[in-house]
Amino acid sequence: MSESKAETPSKSAEKGVASLSTSAPPSSTTPTAQAKQTPPPVATTARPMASRLPRTIAAEGGGTEKKQSHLAEDRIAQYLPKQDAVDHSNLAALLQPFTEASYEREFDVKVNGIASKAELTAVAETWASRLNVPKENSAVLAQEIAIHCYHNGSSEQTDFNLKSSQVAGLNLEAAVGVIKEILTLRQFAAYYATFVWNWGIKNEIPPANWVAKGYTDETKYAAFDTFSYVGSPLGLRITPTRKPTNNEYMAASVNAREKIIQSRGKGMVTNSPMFSDGTTHQGIPLHPKLPLS
């Protein structure tokens, strides 16, 4: 009986250890021991930076190019049917191989600087309906306006208060007013650039103000503001009497830049360029500042 109730030394030791771990106060230790027993800091639960970014950036790793690609796909997706209803036959039609006939087609291309065929048609029809201009006279009226721009420029301030020499009883200002309702006067004049170029050379009549613009005798036929459209396939389809020279291109380019500088009010203009040798003078101030006394 006494042997069954007695506890073995090992079990007594285990109970002693358990009581120390639960009820006994912590024993005093040195500062070094306390430092060693300090538990490690708990990891913070702050969200990483990527999770705080917008979904489109975080999902793509924050890359600018990937974000732009993602946004572009979203814009395109609105024009496409739902994924389960995509019809790839339209895509196949776009990817068909091009044939020789593809290169023979004519396309009505719209360029901002020059009149389109649709705009010119609208001008001619309005001339006929509003100003009673016979359709057979539309071409010669357009040429008359283009020649006027050749000599006086094609800005919105160009004066057209004169009678037409080609259409009896018509004031050119009314005809130009119709043009300005549909397109700019410069776009209209640009369409006839090759025509006025040929007309000037064949009749030996350069633009009236070529000297005032600083052109030389060698470059005088380029002294009109739509010169850059001479020979353009988008203009009136006639062959230029001759191809403009490099000096003529240079003269027109410098003169155009000078006009831009003046119109922007920078206070600086170039001197008349010496186009014969391809050089220009240094710019001089329009209103030089005088030293204060």
UniProtKB/Swiss-Prot annotation:
A single GO molecular-function term is:
structural molecule activity
Q: Which Pfam families match?
A: Flexi_CP (PF00286)
Regions of biased composition (Basic and acidic residues) lie at 1-14
Q: Where in the cell is it found?
A: Virion; Host chloroplast envelope
UniProt lists compositionally biased (Low complexity) regions at 18-37
Q: What are the record keywords, sorted? A: Capsid protein, Helical capsid protein, Host-virus interaction, Ribonucleoprotein, Virion
> Segment Disordered: which positions?
1-49
- Looking at the UniProt entry, the stretches that span the membrane are none
A GO cellular component annotation in the UniProt record = ribonucleoprotein complex
Subunit arrangement?
A: Interacts with host NbANKr; this interaction targets the capsid protein to the host chloroplast.
Q: Which family does it belong to?
A: Belongs to the potexvirus capsid protein family.
Instruction: Describe the function of this protein.
Output: Required for genome encapsidation. Forms ribonucleoprotein complexes along with TGB1 helicase and viral RNA.
Q: Kindly provide the name given to this protein in its UniProt entry.
A: Capsid protein
Which organism is this protein's natural source? Lolium latent virus (isolate Lolium/USA/US1/-) (LoLV)
